[in-house]
Amino acid sequence: MAQIRYYATGRRKTSVAKVWLSPGNGKIIVNDKNMEEYFPLETLRIIVKQPLTLTETLNKYDVIAKVKGGGLSGQAGALRHGIARALVLADPTLRPVLKKAGFLTRDPRMVERKKYGLKKARRAPQFSKR
């Protein structure tokens, strides 16, 4: 018998997470590594687990994810977005809770481009009066 798997994608900054959610006991595997191995900081692990802890489904589903692009913070955010979307596919009654927490909304903030004549996006070169 084939196991039910729910697929969703999450995005944040330049990171894209492909998430497969299946009934299980709470294992989270990111890029073929354990989540504790992949995300060295506890804060990043908390971000990834947020949708599951909020909906009290932490030990009900296994998460397998492939993450590409960006840094660890962006990848954690993309993973959170993907897990939240997959949870809604698995159980549509969780949608209002996740929506209220803002986990279903794609964070539109991106890195601002560098402009010519400036050192960074907004940082101007030092001004000398004399």
Swiss-Prot record:
InterPro entries: Ribosomal_Su5_D2-typ_SF (IPR020568), Ribosomal_uS9 (IPR000754), Ribosomal_uS9_bac/plastid (IPR023035), Ribosomal_uS9_CS (IPR020574), Ribsml_uS5_D2-typ_fold_subgr (IPR014721). PROSITE patterns: RIBOSOMAL_S9. One of its GO terms (molecular function) is RNA binding. GO terms for biological process: translation. One of its GO terms (cellular component) is cytosolic small ribosomal subunit. Disulfide bonds: none annotated. Keywords: Ribonucleoprotein, Ribosomal protein. Belongs to the universal ribosomal protein uS9 family. HAMAP family: Ribosomal_uS9_B. PANTHER family: RIBOSOMAL PROTEIN S9, SMALL RIBOSOMAL SUBUNIT PROTEIN US9M. This is Small ribosomal subunit protein uS9. It comes from Caldicellulosiruptor saccharolyticus (strain ATCC 43494 / DSM 8903 / Tp8T 6331). The lineage of its organism: Bacteria, Bacillati, Bacillota, Bacillota incertae sedis, Caldicellulosiruptorales. The gene is rpsI.
